[in-house]
Amino acid sequence: MALWRSSDNTVYLPPPSVAKVVNTDDYVTRTGIYYYAGSSRLLTVGHPYFKVPVNGGRKQEIPKVSAYQYRVFRVSLPDPNKFGLPDPSLYNPDTQRLVWACIGVEIGRGQPLGVGVSGHPLYNRLDDTENSHFSSAVSTQDSRDNVSVDYKQTQLCIIGCVPAMGEHWAKGKACKSTQQGDCPPLELVNTAIEDGDMIDTGYGAMDFRTLQETKSEVPLDICQSVCKYPDYLQMSADVYGDSMFFCLRKEQLFARHFWNRGGMVGDTIPSELYIKGTDIRERPGTHVYSPSPSGSMVSSDSQLFNKPYWLHKAQGHNNGICWHNQLFITVVDTTRSTNFTLSACTETAIPAVYSPTKFKEYTRHVEEYDLQFIFQLCTITLTADVMAYIHTMNPAILDNWNIGVTPPPSASLVDTYRYLQSAAIACQKDAPTPEKKDPYDDLKFWNVDLKEKFSTELDQFPLGRKFLLQVGARRRPTIGPRKRPASAKSSSSASKHKRKRVSK
């Protein structure tokens, strides 16, 4: 007897449809007009480890300037819709808008290569666990020492039209009450990378201020700071691709020394992991190990800077379009981390015999940058689909173009008084128009204004000449020897001579 039964195979339904994100090349039309823009020489000087107040804080303090900080340049571009164009008929302002596309960039770095060191005069170092002769028990005395290290070597460049995102581990909120001295819970935090934020130096991307209360586990410049690491996973998965058009990075690190930490051990070693010893080895020492990082040798053979880069295809959907007429350049370069040592005599005349009490020692760090760009002028036709897509992506773009979206009509009844100036009714003053707020007003960047530094004479600038060489454009000569036109007399005689030869 035949018996019918339903199939045991699992039926997979198609996933629900999602809104498709299109590439900027699908609605942005590129023109053949290119501009060069470059900054001036950008310099900064400060103390490499901490801020220094001057005269008890009455004057502006000496800033903290370290090679292990992020340099985030916010580059402001002119509005192309208000720009003096070489061809006024290039676009129709009634149906089109102009935008900039970044197609070339060169980040120049001055100063020689060098290795900088950082350290802590009271560094929490207990034993040398690499060449240890005996296992010491838990130390009850202050074993901190003056230690310096050379950090991890990093070169980094991230370019986008919004700030780059960073990640670090911070102190989280525990689900239940904990006792004083318990290990705090960890939480991964994502924040924008600002100018002056510390990079990962080899000790991890974490909030050292809240997670290391001894203030001696890491060197001075990061013991009360937050070290951030770029969140490449999130920026690569950015829906619109604004945070990272492309990135360049090189990292190098090895462990130079191996130590353990002083203090009471929070997590006891399980007894099944070792066999108890005798005498001084009856109780094992601390197992909280920590290496000292080192970035090793720096070389000009592995430099990312002082060379041009051309953007043909971005890694995301934004192929170099500078929304809101701005760019964010995030830079790290630890290969030029030399810290200057300065000395000043405390007396008017320099003594003939050296005495350390008559001299003051100082340390400073300097940085030098130069930014150059090649921009391409592009047009966007304001069709209904394009405007709806841009409004979904970022409504502020349409507001900056003076294009408003009409709100739907209100279904509720609106009260309208007749005598607006009458004292018998409440004040009918119109609400003030809210000012446009900068979305990055609370963030810190190094502002670079290029609104008056655009030029179409590409052959007059180093990066412009490199770009012309790439595209194969030949420059038309403006001066120099030219072929002299033949005189009328010689032309007439030549014609007669030619006719004479033909008559034969």
UniProtKB/Swiss-Prot annotation:
Keyword Disulfide bond: yes
Cell location: Virion; Host nucleus
A cellular-component GO term for this protein: host cell nucleus
Any one GO molecular-function label of the UniProt entry: structural molecule activity
Keyword check for Cell inner membrane: no
Annotated region described as Disordered, given as residue ranges: 474-504
Keywords: Capsid protein, Disulfide bond, Host nucleus, Host-virus interaction, Late protein, T=7 icosahedral capsid protein, Viral attachment to host cell, Viral penetration into host cytoplasm, Virion, Virus endocytosis by host, Virus entry into host cell
BP-aspect Gene Ontology terms: endocytosis involved in viral entry into host cell; virion attachment to host cell
Superkingdom classification of source: Viruses
Quaternary context: Self-assembles into homopentamers. The capsid has an icosahedral symmetry and consists of 72 capsomers, with each capsomer being a pentamer of L1. Interacts with the minor capsid protein L2; this interaction is necessary for viral genome encapsidation. Interacts with protein E2; this interaction enhances E2-dependent replication and transcription activation.
Name under which the protein is recorded: Major capsid protein L1
Organism: Human papillomavirus type 70
Upper classification of the organism: Viruses, Monodnaviria, Shotokuvirae, Cossaviricota, Papovaviricetes
